[in-house]
């Protein structure tokens, strides 16, 4: 393949790609790592780390419910008029619960975005710094970024829109937490190897990786882990397609708590 239609430069091991929602796995891993360091509990509520949310309904939602998309009413995307940090705060301050937290799954960038922001606040660093200076190095990912450095721009592949025009990921509210990671193929192979062989990581990071694999909720044949969605192995193409259906991605669906952990899983994002 080529990196860009503009110069027809071939894709190689240095090419940097936008990961989209795969970024959510890194956000979940950061939260699991913060938990392993005793910086937060998944049963905590947002105002413990963001006091301005103390009197808002979002404070009735736990961090676990945020990372598993079960807040009760957070939508797929922020409204178009929410752009600045202050607007993000005001959005959460004025948000209202619709369904009981923990009982309905609604895939949501604001939900995992807030989880990532709370994680960073618990670690007392900006979210971008947490990923670029702590999480990526622990995976030994040396060419993975939130903000692609100037000297790496020549390796940064373009995406293409429906009109076949080159585009970059659009900036947005809590974008780094939900869809902001860019990486190379060799780095992503390191990431996959760490998840397939977590015992090779040092003890605190092994604990964080394994935490992201734990299933918490079940929606049909799909189990919601942290960042990942998993399925019993073996599974079928039809089951995987169902998990990407409009109903699952765009709507609120009742879930049941997962009490058993499958030994063999198919991981999906």
What are these regions (language model features)?
Residues 2, 56-268:
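Short, surface-exposed loop or secondary-structure junction motifs
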Residues 6-65, 97-111, 176-179:
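Short active-site loop at a secondary-structure junction
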């Amino acid at each position: 393949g080529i990196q860009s239609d503009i110069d027809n430069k071939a894709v190689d091991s240095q090419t940097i790609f936008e990961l989209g929602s795969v970024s959510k796995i890194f956000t979940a891993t950061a939260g699991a790592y913060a938990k392993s360091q005793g910086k937060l509990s998944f049963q905590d509520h947002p105002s413990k780390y963001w006091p301005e949310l103390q009197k808002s309904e979002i404070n009735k939602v736990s961090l676990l419910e945020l990372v598993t998309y079960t807040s009760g009413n957070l939508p797929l995307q922020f409204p178009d008029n929410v752009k600045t940090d202050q607007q993000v705060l005001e959005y959460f301050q004025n948000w209202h619960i619709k369904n009981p937290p923990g009982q309905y799954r609604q895939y949501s960038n604001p939900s995992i975005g807030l989880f990532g922001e709370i994680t960073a606040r618990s670690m007392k660093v900006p979210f971008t710094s947490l990923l670029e200076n702590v999480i990526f190095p622990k995976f030994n990912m040396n060419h993975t970024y939130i903000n692609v450095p100037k000297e790496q721009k020549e390796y940064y592949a373009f995406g293409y829109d429906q009109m076949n025009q080159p585009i970059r990921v659009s900036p947005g509210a809590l974008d780094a937490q939900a869809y902001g990671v860019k990486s190379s193929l060799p780095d992503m192979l390191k990431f996959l190897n760490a998840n397939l062989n977590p015992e090779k990581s040092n003890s605190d990071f092994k604990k964080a990786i394994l935490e992201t694999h734990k299933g918490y909720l079940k929606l049909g044949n799909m189990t919601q882990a942290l960042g990942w969605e998993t399925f019993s192995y073996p599974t079928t193409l039809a089951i995987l397609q169902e998990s990407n259906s409009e109903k699952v991605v765009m709507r609120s669906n009742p879930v049941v708590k997962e009490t058993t952990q499958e030994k063999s899983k198919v991981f999906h994002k």
